[in-house]
Design a protein with these regions (language model features):
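C-terminal regulatory/effector modules of DNA-binding transcriptional regulators
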Residues: 122-195
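Extreme N-terminal segment that seeds HTH/winged-HTH DNA-binding domains in transcriptional regulators
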Residues: 1-32
Length: 195
């Protein structure tokens, strides 16, 4: 195995350690975590991963960088007719946080419950990324409180009044009786395919 492939294997081992422990191993423990036999090997690995932008040294400690949490984006794959396979010699890197969250200071997540938004691609159990304090417009999918009850729906304008429109014909449009407060705009969503 060449050095670059070995470093990727070590990096992925460190990612697994981080996911399980929510902490980074000390230099002393890193040899055991990644399977190196010497302190010199650990120092060399940390140096290479730091030079590549995955790790940083701060106050004598090692910490993961934003790039540590980025993953390879291998390109696109057709959902229709299969296409020739690219060799993926080069690849882009994707950080999910950067992809989904433009304003971390005003972003939260909500779990979708129910099937009123399936036409918009939101399924029961999906996680929606909600951006607060964002201007809204008709057509936006929003998390709103209508007459004291929270929901996720498409914002629409009918006869000069805002209404909440489901994206499933089995449900009716919600016309606010007394109050409508938009808590935020849905700017993204994700789901685990292994629920």
């Amino acid at each position: 195995m060449d050095a670059a492939a070995a470093d990727i294997r070590y990096l992925n081992t460190l990612r697994v350690h981080w996911k399980r422990n929510k902490a980074f191993p000390s230099m002393a423990k890193m040899a055991d975590v990644v399977g190196l036999k010497s302190a010199a090997g650990v120092f060399a690995l940390v140096g290479r991963l730091s030079d590549a932008g995955y790790l940083q040294r701060t106050d004598g400690r090692i910490a993961p960088t934003k790039k540590f949490f980025s993953y390879r984006l291998l390109g696109s794959v057709r959902a229709g007719v299969p296409q020739e396979v690219d060799q993926y010699e080069g690849f882009e890197v994707l950080n999910v946080e950067d992809y989904l969250i433009a304003h971390p200071e005003r972003t939260s997540f909500c779990t979708v419950r129910g099937d009123s938004m399936t036409g918009a691609g939101l399924l029961d159990g999906d996680i929606v990324v909600v951006e607060h304090n964002t201007p809204t417009k008709p057509g936006d999918i929003v998390v709103a409180v209508v007459d004291g009850r929270a929901t996720v729906k498409s914002l629409a304008l009918e006869a000069g009044e805002y209404v909440l429109k489901p994206e499933n014909p089995a449900y009716e449009v919600i016309r606010p009786g007394e109050s409508l407060e938009v808590l935020g705009v849905v700017v993204g969503s994700f789901r685990s395919m292994r629920r």
